[in-house]
């Protein structure tokens, strides 16, 4: 008896995997083309800035809940921009061709020292120290 082999058939799992990879490639290549490369760069810069402010706020809140004199050193990936603080509001903004302003409200007053302006995308060092029940000093290094 002859057995016929069916050639050219692929499994359903492989075909779904192949279509998923193909769709991911089309989206990855098409997004900058549809919206422009500058738009993609600005969105990624704003996303990185939001993550930097969130990480800074999280660590300030962590230090503020500890005893006086507690110090923590934090490394933060940061896009170009300027850090600022007004009482208990922490903010990061950027002017120029890509403009944004990201703020976060903390439970404790913030005193910001050091080099507050970041000129190029880099990892900055933040030394966060609790000085009393109502104030935290944040010193930025690049």
Curated annotation (Swiss-Prot):
Residue ranges annotated as motif QXSXEXXXL: 9-17
Subcellular location: Secreted; Cell surface; Fimbrium
Pfam families: Class_IIIsignal
Propeptide: 1-8
Main localization of the protein described in the UniProt heading: secreted
UniProtKB keywords: Fimbrium, Secreted
UniProt-recorded name of the protein: Probable pilin MJ0832.1
Organism encoding this protein: Methanocaldococcus jannaschii (strain ATCC 43067 / DSM 2661 / JAL-1 / JCM 10045 / NBRC 100440) (Methanococcus jannaschii)
């Amino acid at each position: 008896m002859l057995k016929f082999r069916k050639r050219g058939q692929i499994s359903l799992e492989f075909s779904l995997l192949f279509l998923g990879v193909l769709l991911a490639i089309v989206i990855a290549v098409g997004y900058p083309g549809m919206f422009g490369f500058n738009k993609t760069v600005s969105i990624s810069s704003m996303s990185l800035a939001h993550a930097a402010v969130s990480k800074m706020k999280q660590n300030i809140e962590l230090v503020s809940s500890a005893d006086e004199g507690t110090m923590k050193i934090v490394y933060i990936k940061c896009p170009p921009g300027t850090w600022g603080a007004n009482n208990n509001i922490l903010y990061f903004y950027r002017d120029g061709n890509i403009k944004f302003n990201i703020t976060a409200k903390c439970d404790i007053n913030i005193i910001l020292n050091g080099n507050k302006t970041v000129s190029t995308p880099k990892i900055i060092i933040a030394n966060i120290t609790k000085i009393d029940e109502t104030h935290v000093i944040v010193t930025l290094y690049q």
